[in-house]
Structures are given as C-alpha cells and as structure tokens.
A protein has these predicted regions:
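Flavin-dependent oxidoreductase catalytic cores
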Residues: 1-134
Length: 134
C-alpha cells in the first residue's frame, strides 16, 4: 500500500491544511496508521509530495515564479537557500516516515510537481546551478 501525497512542509502542501509529516505529533498520528497496517501483516509506504507551483495556496514556492494553470497563485521563486531548505525538509520527512513505521517512501518527482518543475525548461527559468539556462 502507498499513501496519497504527504507534504514535507507547509509551503509544499497541495492546499493549506493538507496532510503532512512536520513534527513528533504527526509521527505519532501516522504511527496509528502504520501499526494498523502491520497488524494485518501488510506493508505500507508513504508518498512524499511537494506540490511546488501546483499548490493551491498563497505560500507556494517553485524554481521560477510561473503560475500553474490549476492554481490562482503565482509561486514565490526560491533562492539557493530556499531550495536547500526544501531538500532538507524532504529528507527530514523521509526520516520521520521511518520513525512512524512506514516500510518505505516514494518521493513524487513526476506529473509536474516540485521536483519535475526543476527538470522542465517551461517551469525552470533559472540561470544559477539549479537552472537549465547555464
């Protein structure tokens, strides 16, 4: 079993209040789910999903400030420190998933979400080490 997308931080959530794994309280809540699955001899992985420009909220962030067709919000362009923070938050979320008892993680890197936004020229207009336009 694989969960639906779990946000690594508030700015990466699909919408404000979206499911996340941000702190020890969230770990405890997720452990309730993983314990139930394991109690039935099942396995469960957690999908980490950072929505990037697809987030439906005013605090969304992305490689470049290009509005998505599915959200009215223009994302804030991340600087290098902000990009590193997003990476660190994804790693921290994977570690919290382990602590919550998940058997694995899947990091969503396709379908136009955050990681994919770095890989596509249309959504990445950067000229630094994180961009296509070097």
């Amino acid at each position: 079993m694989v969960t639906g997308g779990i946000a690594p931080n508030t700015e990466g959530g699909v919408f404000p209040g979206a499911a996340g794994l941000f702190d020890a309280d969230d770990v405890a809540n997720h452990k309730i789910v993983t314990d139930r699955v394991h109690g039935s001899d099942g396995k469960i992985a957690m999908q980490i999903l950072h929505a990037g420009r697809y987030a439906y909220g005013p605090n969304c962030v992305a490689p470049s400030p290009i509005k998505s067709p599915i959200s009215p919000f223009v994302p804030a362009e991340l600087d290098a420190v902000g990009i590193e923070k997003q990476i660190d938050d994804i790693v921290t979320t994977a570690c919290r998933a382990r602590d919550a008892g998940y058997d694995g993680v899947e990091i969503m890197g396709s379908e136009g979400y955050f990681i994919n936004q770095f890989l596509v020229l249309h959504t990445n207009k950067r000229t630094d080490q994180w961009g296509w336009l070097l």
